[in-house]
Each structure stands twice: as structure tokens, then as C-alpha cells.
Amino acid sequence: MYDASDLRKGLKFEIDGDPFVIVDFQFKKPGKGQALYKCKLRNMISGAQFERTFRSGDKFNEASLEEHDMEYLYSEGGNFCFMNSVSFEQEFLGKDQVGDAVNLLKDNTVCTVLFFNGKAIGLTLPNFVNLRIVQSDPWAKGDTATGSTKPATLETGYEIQVPPFVDEGQLVKIDTRTCEYVERVNE
């Protein structure tokens, strides 16, 4: 059980039987009266966001969430199949549950799948993934302006900006939190 004073960005709790995560948080203490906690919440099932103000003394139930490492197998008709590496059970997530992770998701990637009351509701990619560049314009020597980048298409079809020295066919490390190039990977 959480108290209003426990509210922080990233905290997960239940309201009316649905899991919510705090996206943004502000604390206000007026000169008189109770402290106010203004929160921007995201419903972890529907993805809907809204603002809500809580008062000190409000209480919340902890969300009964579980995380399992699961391996991505394939996609079929807008559904993505993941397999538990221990029990070999398969779970399907819809495109709305996978979200932007679809841009960096390739076969056999181990992800953390989030469950609420036994039902898969979302996933988190590892912090870094290695993907191959399948299309990139050649680099002309002399085009070395500081901080220059060029577009490159990854094996998943997602386009990112890479330094000019990265060529087609090379393996690159991508930060999944920012969807940005980190470094080349030696094979």
C-alpha cells in the first residue's frame, strides 16, 4: 500500500483495478492546507495519459506486476510472439503493446515482458541492441564537417542517423532508449 507521499516519477500503482505509471510529478505545498501531488499518469494497458491531483493522506494499492525475460520469435498479422526461455510458454503482444520497440526488434532478441494479473501488457527492450545496416549512402572523403551524419536503414527497416564512416553491411550498436547510434561492433 502506497501513501501519497510515496508518489515519484516511474512509480507503478493501481487505480480502479488498472495499472498506472507516473510519467511526470509535481509536489505543491500551499501556505495553508494539505500538500498536493500533481501527477501525469499513463494507463499501462490502454496507453491513455491524463493528469490527476492527489492530496496527502490518499492511499494506493501496489500494482501486481511481474516481469519475465522472453525471447522474440516472430510477428504475424500485427501480433508479436514471445517465448519464455524457462517454461517455453508463448505469449502474443499486439502492435499497440509493443509500441516503438517494433523499430528495433529482431528475431531472438531477449526482452523483458511485463505482466498484470497474468496477462502480458507491454515490453522493454534491452538497453542496447546490435543491428546490421542494410542501406546507407557511400561516404565521400572530404565531407568531414564536424558532427556530420547520414541516414542509414537498419535490418528492421528503421532509419537512423549514423556517422559518415559507417558503411552498408556493418553491425552497429543502438541505444534502445533513444534509438540512436552508439558505436560500430566488431564481428
Curated annotation (Swiss-Prot):
PROSITE patterns: EFP. One of its GO terms (cellular component) is cytoplasm. One of its GO terms (molecular function) is translation elongation factor activity. The keyword Repeat does not apply. Pfam families: EFP, EFP_N, Elong-fact-P_C. The keyword DNA damage does not apply. Pathway: Protein biosynthesis; polypeptide chain elongation. One of its GO terms (biological process) is peptide biosynthetic process. Keywords: Cytoplasm, Elongation factor, Protein biosynthesis. Signal peptide: none annotated. SUPFAM superfamilies: Nucleic acid-binding proteins, Translation proteins SH3-like domain. It is found in: Cytoplasm. Belongs to the elongation factor P family. HAMAP family: EF_P. NCBIfam families: efp (TIGR00038), PRK00529.1 (NF001810). Involved in peptide bond synthesis. Stimulates efficient translation and peptide-bond synthesis on native or reconstituted 70S ribosomes in vitro. Probably functions indirectly by altering the affinity of the ribosome for aminoacyl-tRNA, thus increasing their reactivity as acceptors for peptidyl transferase. This is Elongation factor P. It comes from Desulforapulum autotrophicum (strain ATCC 43914 / DSM 3382 / VKM B-1955 / HRM2) (Desulfobacterium autotrophicum).
